[in-house]
């Protein structure tokens, strides 16, 4: 069950990443071709009515003019509609052509504009990026709960011996200090025994357990809310089919969007409806056999040298992990901000960020 869930979550992360990249490429193509603008137009300006306009994609064979020489309404969200207004022609400059029989059907009076490149960026690309981040956070929180928190099924638990700091301390003590460091392993074993006891209580009566352990309840609820937020942001892509900007999307891209949404829904439903593991029947007073190697520890020699080496292994591993984590976060944040700014300038000519 746990392995299948982890594989499913990794599959969701992979699907969101691939679709987001495809959407960015498609939006870049729209921006370069100048086909990312749509207009709320009236064929006959004398029949002006806010309910009678129709949205249509920019067409270079048509003539677009502002109704009454007034700037049309934009689409909101600070959507750079000034880019779309550059295609508008002053009505007075074509007054002679407007009365011509062959030209009049090509004139469109514009009452509103919308830059769909900005809409797709602000609404969908950023929502998918947030969904990807929330799914990643959920995956990390879930793995930590499986290692240090309570779980309902034994198959969902992860041995605390796999804790990164425990492994780092063991490697440093073995490779650099030529000694055997078991203090962290013993501590992880004690945590695992305590965690297993809490998990049995949680499995027998989850509601009472969460009532008596409010911190665990808050953490589990937070984990669920993070996943729910990721699902909502991801499925918000469905709105792409019901907005005027749907006109700038090709049929093949709409098909890819439908396939992507279908994959996410199928994976989430499979995780929701998948049955849990069946516990074997046990006789009264019978206890399950514990794995012999679960808390097996090597005996380490004693002495001042070994004590100093163990302290060094613990300190060095702690500092090393924190330094690597800080460097990773700095590089990740700088890369994301710089890439987003560069991409916004390429798409819109300017960026939201200063």
UniProtKB/Swiss-Prot annotation:
The chain crosses the membrane at residues 119-141, 172-194, 206-226, 253-273, 316-336. The keyword Metal-binding does not apply. Residues 142-171, 227-252, 337-354 are cytoplasmic. Keywords: Glycoprotein, Host cell membrane, Host endosome, Host Golgi apparatus, Host membrane, Membrane, Signal, Syncytium formation induced by viral infection, Transmembrane, Transmembrane helix, Viral primary envelope fusion with host outer nuclear membrane, Viral release from host cell. InterPro entries: GK. It is a multi-pass membrane protein. Coiled coil: none annotated. Interacts (via UL20 interaction region) with protein UL20 homolog (via N-terminus); this interaction probably plays a role in the coordinate transport of protein UL20 homolog and gK to the trans-Golgi network (TGN), and is required for the cell surface expression of gK. Glycoprotein that probably modulates membrane fusion events during secondary envelopment of cytoplasmic capsids that bud into specific trans-Golgi network (TGN)-derived membranes. This is Envelope glycoprotein K. It comes from Gallid herpesvirus 2 (strain Chicken/Md5/ATCC VR-987). The lineage of its organism: Viruses, Duplodnaviria, Heunggongvirae, Peploviricota, Herviviricetes.
């Amino acid at each position: 069950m746990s392995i299948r869930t982890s594989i499913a979550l990794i599959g969701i992360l992979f699907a969101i990443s691939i679709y987001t990249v495809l959407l960015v490429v498609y939006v870049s193509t729209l921006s370069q071709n100048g086909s990312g603008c749509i207009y709320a137009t009236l064929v006959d300006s004398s029949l002006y009515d806010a309910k009678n306009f129709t949205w249509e994609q920019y067409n270079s064979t048509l003539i677009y003019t502002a109704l009454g020489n007034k700037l049309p309404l934009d689409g909101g969200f600070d959507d750079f509609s000034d880019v779309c207004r550059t295609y508008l022609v002053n009505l007075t400059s074509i007054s002679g052509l407007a009365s011509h029989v062959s030209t009049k059907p090509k004139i469109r009076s514009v009452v509103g504009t919308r830059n769909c490149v900005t809409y797709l960026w602000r609404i969908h690309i950023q929502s998918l990026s947030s969904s990807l981040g929330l799914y990643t956070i959920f995956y990390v929180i879930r793995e930590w709960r499986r290692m240090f928190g309570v779980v309902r099924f034994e198959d969902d638990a992860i041995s605390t011996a796999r804790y990164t700091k425990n492994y780092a301390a063991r490697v440093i003590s073995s490779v650099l200090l030529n000694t055997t460091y078991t203090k962290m392993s013993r501590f992880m074993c004690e945590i695992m025994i305590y965690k297993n006891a809490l998990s049995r209580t949680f499995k027998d009566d989850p509601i009472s357990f969460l009532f008596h352990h409010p911190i665990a309840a808050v953490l589990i609820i937070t984990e669920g809310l993070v996943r729910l937020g990721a699902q909502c942001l991801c499925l918000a892509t469905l709105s792409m089919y019901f907005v005027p900007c749907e006109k700038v999307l090709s049929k093949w891209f709409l098909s890819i969007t439908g396939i992507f949404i279908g994959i996410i829904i199928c994976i989430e439903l499979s995780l929701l409806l998948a049955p849990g593991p069946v516990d074997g029947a046990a006789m009264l007073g019978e206890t399950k056999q514990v794995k012999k190697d679960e808390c097996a520890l090597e005996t380490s020699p004693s002495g001042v040298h070994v004590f100093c080496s163990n302290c060094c292994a613990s300190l060095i591993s702690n500092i090393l992990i924190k330094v690597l984590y800080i460097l990773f976060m700095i590089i990740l944040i700088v890369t994301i901000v710089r890439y987003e700014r560069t991409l916004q300038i390429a798409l819109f000519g300017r960026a939201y960020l200063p």
